Amino acid sequence: MDLPGPIHDFLLVFLGSGLLVGGLGVVLLPNPIFSAFSLGFVLFCISLLYILSNSHFVAAAQLLIYVGAINVLIIFAVMFMNDSEYSTDFNLWTVGNGITSLVCTTILFSLLSTILDTSWYGVIWTTRLNQILEQDLISNSQQIGIHLSTDFFLPFELISIILLVALIGAISVARQ
């Protein structure tokens, strides 16, 4: 950010003190849930420091990956492991599980048949790819966005499907 010197210094000291307080909270708080939330605050302050140093894409990646995914995973694991009571009436198979597995299997086979029957060499991702890349793009974020939406579109979408399946699996494990 292009800020005047005193404002930049104030924000730097404010975020640094937030990092110190959050780090002390991670180490000193006795409840692991509060420690995990404090870790999320530390990671959020780090992303704000990236914004302060004009690294906007790194800040967005920090928020999405570390605060949004890793910290949520840590909180999920802590909450899952703190449950000392185990359910004694655990049903291995219910009607809902059968319906869900039937729907998921149908979707899987329809996706597999679509993927195998499609001629991927004939697909034109975009007609203006060379024109877009020849332009002077303003930032690295725009270049990454162009490559994700053209060259790496299919792997990007496959990763999003894998993450969706992992999220659904985590929710189903947490509900049991």
Curated annotation (Swiss-Prot):
Its main location: plastid. One of its GO terms (molecular function) is NADH dehydrogenase (ubiquinone) activity. It catalyses: a plastoquinone + NADH + (n+1) H(+)(in) = a plastoquinol + NAD(+) + n H(+)(out); a plastoquinone + NADPH + (n+1) H(+)(in) = a plastoquinol + NADP(+) + n H(+)(out). NDH shuttles electrons from NAD(P)H:plastoquinone, via FMN and iron-sulfur (Fe-S) centers, to quinones in the photosynthetic chain and possibly in a chloroplast respiratory chain. The immediate electron acceptor for the enzyme in this species is believed to be plastoquinone. Couples the redox reaction to proton translocation, and thus conserves the redox energy in a proton gradient. Its EC number is 7.1.1.-. This is NAD(P)H-quinone oxidoreductase subunit 6, chloroplastic. GO terms for cellular component: chloroplast thylakoid membrane. Signal peptide: none annotated. Gene3D superfamilies: NADH-ubiquinone/plastoquinone oxidoreductase chain 6, subunit NuoJ. Pfam families: Oxidored_q3. NDH is composed of at least 16 different subunits, 5 of which are encoded in the nucleus. It is a multi-pass membrane protein. The chain crosses the membrane at residues 10-30, 32-52, 61-81, 92-112, 152-172. Belongs to the complex I subunit 6 family. It is found in: Plastid, Chloroplast thylakoid membrane. Keywords: Chloroplast, Membrane, NAD, NADP, Plastid, Plastoquinone, Quinone, Thylakoid, Translocase, Transmembrane, Transmembrane helix, Transport.
